[in-house]
Amino acid sequence: MQLGRHNSGSIKKRLEMYILSIISASLDYKSAAIDIRERFSYTSTRIREILRRIKAADGVSGAVLLCTCNRTELYISGDNIENMNPALLLCQLSGEEDHKSLMTLFSIRHDSEAIFHLMEVACGLQSMVLFEDRVITQVKNAAAISREEKTIDSTLETLFRLCITAAKKAKTEIKVKAVPTSAAERAITELSKKYCFTDKRILVIGNGEIGRLCCKKLIELGAEITITLRKYKHGEIIIPVGCNTIPYDEREEVLPLSDVVISATTSPHFTITYDMIEKLERKPEIFVDLALPRDIESSISNFTGVELYNLDRFYTDYSVLNQKEVSKIREIINHFILQFEKWKDYREEAAFTKIPDLHNDTLYGRFPLFIDLSGKKVLVVGGGEIATRRVKTLLRFGADIYLVAPHLTSELQEMLNCKLINYREGYYESQDIQNMFLVIAATNDRETNHKVYLDAKEKGIQMSIADCREECSFYFPAIFEFDGIVGGLVSQNGDNHSLVKSVAEQIRKIGQATD
């Protein structure tokens, strides 16, 4: 792209703002053992501190730090950052003095390589558990923290949004073979090949997501589970069905009664120490540490008859079983990389225009198009509160509603009594979608909603899927009207429903005030 023909220093300045480089540093289970990885494992508070420090560096426009039990990855965008070493930054900010040896464990990627790698990470292709579910949430949370700290710029915001969308599309459309969906499931699956857990007494330390998943899997295998609970100041305590509970502080009392101990907390300190085990006459046979930083002091493996497992001992390469699926996921990745390149091209071209409105670097994903629904057949699958709200809105636009659900809310029943809607009692079947103009899936069952999506996609029917915005061909709007004006509100990505609802309410109040 040549600048000379434009004779504008301001355009060059705008281009410097818009065309930013991306650089990343990655440390994961492939390059570093767990004792190294835990040195670069950070609390949420520490992540925020690191992001603020990096954002303040010269040339840095944005920074996102992804930190999981199996990887630490730093993504930086900015101008003239090609010579920046993000691995060195992490070493310095982590207080590590042995920079030279540690930096060799990091993979440094620039621009297209960094973009492709992040896409693969989000889709689970780089995970220790291939195609794992949790990584999507972890990538999403990393971007959210950067957003809260104001360290994410539009380049990384767009990249992470597209990565998350690609990952959810891959998860929805590609079915894989015999792959555990989490570290917890993988650990229990691998251990059950060597040990029989039936009637074994198992202590699970940590009532987070991983701990609860372990409990669920072990109960299926016939184990007797005791799980620890902390005294939380906020939030609901979820106790897995079939588990006994004890306070976290009483875990030592249960150790001599346990055959197996599994620990999966976010504690910065050991939950099980050498001293705790040394004084026991009867020691648990198996210890499983699913935390990073590690929960269980590694020296307990020195005791006779004690086996200690950590995350690195559960790696299994499932990619051989799923080569076709991996290829399909990479096709999805390439599609979203093209979307990102399209967005970058838009920014570059917008920098040359004199029209101020085009200097906005947001490329909207959906166009808000109002269509005539008068007499058009619309299928609504579901009979709950969400379906009720959808039907009430659609009726105001003259749609011919066909409803399929095993049960109806009282409001929907009243609409049926008044012959405002057509109704078939029962569960959704593919034939229900025949000759429909639009389809709304609003059940509380993911499998049903996904089936509606697949059927609608096959027949080329526009669909709104209440529990999965990635499966929506259109987002169902919040409607407002006053003084002859009818409008619909959605967020750019189809999420943030509470904000959309709040804004719509404010607009309605303004309309009422002007009446």
Swiss-Prot record:
Gene Ontology MF, one: sirohydrochlorin ferrochelatase activity
Annotated active site residues, numbered on this chain, are C69 (nucleophile)
Q: Which residues does the annotation list for site: Important for activity? A: H117
EC number(s) given by UniProt: 1.2.1.70, 1.3.1.76, 4.99.1.4
User: Which controlled-vocabulary keywords does the entry list?
Assistant: Cobalamin biosynthesis, Lyase, Multifunctional enzyme, NAD, NADP, Oxidoreductase, Porphyrin biosynthesis
In this chain, the stretch annotated as Precorrin-2 dehydrogenase /sirohydrochlorin ferrochelatase covers: 367-507
Renumbered residue ranges of the record's region Glutamyl-tRNA reductase: 26-174
Q: Which GO terms describe its biological process?
A: cobalamin biosynthetic process; protoporphyrinogen IX biosynthetic process from glutamate; siroheme biosynthetic process
Residues reported in the UniProt entry to bind NADP(+): G206, N207, G208, E209, I210, G211
Record remark: domains? Possesses an unusual extended V-shaped dimeric structure with each monomer consisting of three distinct domains arranged along a curved 'spinal' alpha-helix. The N-terminal catalytic domain specifically recognizes the glutamate moiety of the substrate. The second domain is the NADPH-binding domain, and the third C-terminal domain is responsible for dimerization.
HAMAP family, from UniProt? Glu_tRNA_reductase
What is the annotated role of this protein in its UniProt record? Answer: Multifunctional enzyme that catalyzes the NADPH-dependent reduction of glutamyl-tRNA(Glu) to glutamate 1-semialdehyde (GSA), the NAD-dependent ring dehydrogenation of precorrin-2 to sirohydrochlorin and finally, the ferrochelation of sirohydrochlorin to yield siroheme.
Family membership noted in the UniProt record: In the N-terminal section; belongs to the glutamyl-tRNA reductase family.
| Full protein name | Probable multifunctional siroheme biosynthesis protein HemA
- Which classification does the entry list for the species? Bacteria, Bacillati, Bacillota, Clostridia, Eubacteriales
